[in-house]
Amino acid sequence: MLDSKLLRTELDETAAKLARRGFKLDVETIGKLEEQRKSIQVEVENLQSTRNSISKQIGQLMSAGDKEGAEKIKQQIGSLGSDLDVKKIELDAVMAQLDDIILSVPNIPADEVPNGKDENDNLEISRWGEPKSYDFELKDHVDLGEMGDGLDFASAVKITGARFIVMKGQFARLHRAIAQFMLDLHTEEHGYTEMYVPYLVNADSLFGTGQLPKFGKDLFHTEPLTEKASDEEPRKLSLIPTAEVPVTNLVRDTISDEADLPLKMTAHTPCFRSEAGSYGRDTRGLIRMHQFDKVELVQITKPEDSMNALEELTGHAEKVLQLLELPYRKVLLCTGDMGFGSHKTYDLEVWVPAQNTYREISSCSNMWDFQARRMQARFRRKGEKKPELVHTLNGSGLAVGRTMVAILENNQEADGRIAIPTVLQKYMGGATHIG
């Protein structure tokens, strides 16, 4: 969340920056609440000061033997205490209203982020690789998977429902190989530590990374557990929409040493999304699923290092595509297409031949101190007593299912076989083709 000081001391400037995102900050309401807060705060401080001053008189009166006078002072202090309690309740109520507003406010975009309404206003930064030309009729990944008896959507519908998949044989192995290759690359060459994390998280974790309270409808939630451990309340947990949630929350409520930063972590997990609001979009194939695998990259940095870290992290995701020899483009998201908590985001879009277009395969974001403030994730500089908020970054390195789509479609041959990228062949038992 944003620093509340910005809303107290730079309200108009903050509103103007948020307006670039198409977000209208309720300046009038915030201004009124801030005036109330300051007024009540002054009353609280005056009451505390008066109470403290009068309290000193009790000892003096008792020393002088004036018990009656001391008793009157005690009654006066009791009355002041009651007034103080009332004012504290009023102050808490105003602060709660301000907090509710702050939680609904997105992050401020970086100055270099282009203004825009949606994906059509994103800025293309670069392209890598050239889409192939084919002298035969292209098939999409669904047809290729069904021809090879490797993608079984019908069984998934029977077992669960739409937007799920059953993979078999060499297709399942390819899916596993892609994830293993990504993990090996990021841990052995890019300096990340592999993490195994829970796939179910609590509300505090989802709040920390910004999914709650605003985006609860996008998640799959468990029902409260009926079994209780001792006298604990039943827990409501949620399936992770991305490994960003559990991995980033590893630094929640912690103070890291400056020497330990940056922290670079990666995890391969399934991800679960309800895809609320996407009815009718990408209903065919693996592009938009309720359950999909992803290798996530997370970095925790010092504030002055986070922008360079974003370039590095994005480059790590790009390296995966380059080694797989998949054409892609890199775009800088405009203000209207950025995620709620993002300060700056690059998307990588891979070429999908059957759709004759580029599709998102990775989103790499610098969240600035937005998540860190929610999580109270801090670090302490050498020689300093007061800790500072870290900066958090995350990105897909990559989405496994969409990578598989790109491999199947870009590497298809006239006879329906799929050429396995060279870097994956050792994970496929030396096979060069599927089919």
Curated annotation (Swiss-Prot):
Annotated ATP binding sites: R273, S274, E275, E360, I361, S362, S363
Swiss-Prot/TrEMBL catalytic activity: tRNA(Ser) + L-serine + ATP = L-seryl-tRNA(Ser) + AMP + diphosphate + H(+); tRNA(Sec) + L-serine + ATP = L-seryl-tRNA(Sec) + AMP + diphosphate + H(+)
Gene3D superfamilies registered for this protein in UniProt: Bira Bifunctional Protein, Domain 2 (3.30.930.10), Serine-tRNA synthetase, tRNA binding domain (1.10.287.40)
SUPFAM superfamilies the UniProt entry points to: Class II aaRS and biotin synthetases, tRNA-binding arm
Stretches of the chain forming a coiled coil according to its record: none
PROSITE patterns xrefs: AA_TRNA_LIGASE_II
Annotated compartments: Cytoplasm
Gene Ontology annotations for the cellular component aspect, listed alphabetically: cytoplasm
The protein, known as: Serine--tRNA ligase
